[in-house]
């Protein structure tokens, strides 16, 4: 009867991770839309918010490259708005690292499937940024519902 119990989770992730999430088609999603968000508004602090990928180390040359790319993306997003673009048009320069909020609802069978793929890596190594959110969520959920999730083992938890 796993299909009759559900769980809803709010993820705060980057757009790249959100694209991984929505591949789980049996979930239901509500996601913040860059089409209607105008990041030049006070509501957003007149800036874009990005999430540093977990594989970039602060102080490294790769981090510096990424950070500069994020600054350029923000600069040209606002330039396009100032030059007359709508937020829908200007969003074309926004990076995958842009923060988004996604509310995900699914039945317990689908959450088991999600954790097997995205936390335990049963079909191969999951995307590192997806693991970064899936593993802590799995550990929390397994703690509350060991009967439902106790048989799923993480590579580092035997």
Predicted region positions:
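Family-specific signature for flavin-dependent thymidylate synthase
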Residues: 1-158
């Amino acid at each position: 009867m796993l299909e009759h119990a559900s769980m809803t989770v709010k993820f705060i992730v980057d757009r790249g991770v959100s694209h991984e999430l929505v591949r789980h088609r049996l979930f239901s999603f509500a996601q913040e839309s860059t089409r209607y968000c105008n990041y030049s508004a006070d509501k957003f602090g007149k800036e874009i918010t990005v999430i540093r990928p977990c594989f970039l180390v602060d102080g490294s040359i790769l981090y510096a490259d990424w950070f500069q790319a994020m600054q350029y993306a923000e600069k040209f997003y606002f330039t396009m708005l100032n030059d007359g673009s709508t937020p829908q048009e200007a969003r074309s320069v926004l990076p995958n690292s842009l923060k988004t909020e996604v509310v995900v609802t699914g039945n317990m069978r689908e959450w088991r499937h999600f954790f097997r793929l995205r936390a335990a890596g049963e079909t191969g190594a999951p995307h590192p940024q997806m693991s970064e959110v899936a593993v802590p969520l799995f550990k929390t959920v397994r703690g509350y519902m060991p009967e439902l999730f106790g048989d799923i083992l993480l590579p580092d938890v035997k």
